[in-house]
């Protein structure tokens, strides 16, 4: 029966998705490979990286003897992912476009295309993750529309699928999948969930997939790649074409000629004595916890707060300065994957779990407090370094990824508390990373 199952596999032109398609083929499924083009630009040598990736994906399909399709979501990526990315940066937040891309593009646009246009019984990707469903259970799933209300009727989905961490904990990518919908997850297979990266490479080497095995692992912004972010945001521009803006052939309603973000020069100021240490091109380019490159200073200084009103970036010496540490945050309405929200959290209004706000960082024990609007307060058992507005707090209970929420408010830093400024109020939802620095955006 499994031989009749049609699985559409997303191919990126990399080794992980190639091996995912190979493993599906070995299971006897009818496999179709699809390459998504979501960004269109030339690299420094004038070569379009997306075209090279597309060629590599096509070659994978030739080797595996499976059909190949290409789809473009350039317009959707711009509207749903990149525009939000720019807006978040302008507000002084630290966005994660990889999480947004999975939510809006890979597990929405592509997912619907695979099911509605290609007749897929299931969709697959090369992510290192697992779900609580076996393959045959995935094929039996029916479409269930997500509820419009705040909380899902608990009888609506009797056996919700859970998102589980991969066997290879170092490569686990559930962090990036924490906003994926229940409906998409129910129809998804992750062939690499039980494998290590080394074993995946071994499979590729043994099956004539050398052209993807030799490629460097993709890093940086989803579909855009690893770039100098300051140069990318401030210098790259697009032009008016025939009276309307075209981005890779897709019309975009924006100013005819522009830079992504305009430079806004400001000062680096020491949080300890208010000394001006140097200047920068824009306060929004900096994330709490990162090292600030200040001309003329050899010793390291780190970003601890940002003042969007004045355009100043407050910095502190030492990588472990107390101004870098906080133990309290509030998210927007949390996207819960299996239960919305977890029964224990509804019952007790509080729940112990773990969270992380960066991929591959150690999980942090915390206590969640549920608010009536679906947002949560997150109290870390121990203060953590580098919390920033705009990041996603991703929650875990054992091996299960529960979901995530965007960080919109932060509690005072350990430095503020130590100085006796023990203000219990938390920063409003603004483009600042500490209380009281900015007016509301």
Swiss-Prot record:
Its EC number is 2.8.1.14. It is found in: Mitochondrion. Residues 171-173, 358-359 are annotated as: Interaction with tRNA. One of its GO terms (cellular component) is mitochondrion. The record marks 127, 291, 391 as: Interaction with tRNA. Residues 421-441 are annotated as: Disordered. Pfam families: tRNA_Me_trans, tRNA_Me_trans_C, tRNA_Me_trans_M. Its main location: mitochondrion. SUPFAM superfamilies: Adenine nucleotide alpha hydrolases-like. One of its GO terms (molecular function) is ATP binding. Belongs to the MnmA/TRMU family. Catalyzes the 2-thiolation of uridine at the wobble position (U34) of mitochondrial tRNA(Lys), tRNA(Glu) and tRNA(Gln). Required for the formation of 5-taurinomethyl-2-thiouridine (tm5s2U) of mitochondrial tRNA(Lys), tRNA(Glu), and tRNA(Gln) at the wobble position. ATP is required to activate the C2 atom of the wobble base. This is Mitochondrial tRNA-specific 2-thiouridylase 1. It comes from Rattus norvegicus.
């Amino acid at each position: 029966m499994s031989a009749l199952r049609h699985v559409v596999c997303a191919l990126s032109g990399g080794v992980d998705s190639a091996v995912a398609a190979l493993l599906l083929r070995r299971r006897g499924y009818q496999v179709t490979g699809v390459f998504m083009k979501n960004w269109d630009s030339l690299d420094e040598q004038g070569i379009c990286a997306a075209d090279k990736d597309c060629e590599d994906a096509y070659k994978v399909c030739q080797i595996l003897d499976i059909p190949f399709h290409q789809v473009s979501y350039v317009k959707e990526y711009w509207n749903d992912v990149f525009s939000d990315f720019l807006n978040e940066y302008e507000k002084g937040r630290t966005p994660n476009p990889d999480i947004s891309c999975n939510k809006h593009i890979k597990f929405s646009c592509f997912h619907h295309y695979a099911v509605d246009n290609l007749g897929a019984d299931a969709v697959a990707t090369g992510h290192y993750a697992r779900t609580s469903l076996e393959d045959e259970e995935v094929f039996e799933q029916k479409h269930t529309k997500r509820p419009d209300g705040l909380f899902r009727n608990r009888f609506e989905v009797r056996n919700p699928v859970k998102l589980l961490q991969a066997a290879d904990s170092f490569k686990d990518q559930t962090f990036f999948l924490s906003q994926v919908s229940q409906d998409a997850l129910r129809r998804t297979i992750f062939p690499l969930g039980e494998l290590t990266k080394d074993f995946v490479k071994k499979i590729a080497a043994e099956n004539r997939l050398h052209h993807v095995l030799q490629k460097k692992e993709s890093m940086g912004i989803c579909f855009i790649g690893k770039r100098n972010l300051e140069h990318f945001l401030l210098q790259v521009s697009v032009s008016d074409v025939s009276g309307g803006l075209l981005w890779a052939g897709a019309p975009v309603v924006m100013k005819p000629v522009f830079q992504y973000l305009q430079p806004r020069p400001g000062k680096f100021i020491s949080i300890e004595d208010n000394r001006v240490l140097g200047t920068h091109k824009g306060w929004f380019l900096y994330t709490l916890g990162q090292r600030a490159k200040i001309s003329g200073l050899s010793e390291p200084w780190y970003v601890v707060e940002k003042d969007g009103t004045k355009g100043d970036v407050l910095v502190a010496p030492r990588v472990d300065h107390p101004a870098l540490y906080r133990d309290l945050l509030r998210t927007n309405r949390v996207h819960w994957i299996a239960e919305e929200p977890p029964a224990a959290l509804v019952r007790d209004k509080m729940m112990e779990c773990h969270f992380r706000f960066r991929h591959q960082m150690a999980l942090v024990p915390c206590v969640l407090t549920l608010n009536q609007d679906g947002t949560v307060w997150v109290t870390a058992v121990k203060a953590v370094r580098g919390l920033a507005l705009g990041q996603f707090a991703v929650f875990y209970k054992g091996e299960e990824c529960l979901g995530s929420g965007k960080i919109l408010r932060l509690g005072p830093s350990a430095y503020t508390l130590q100085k006796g400024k023990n203000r219990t109020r938390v920063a409003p939802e603004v483009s600042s990373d500490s209380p009281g620095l900015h007016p509301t955006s």
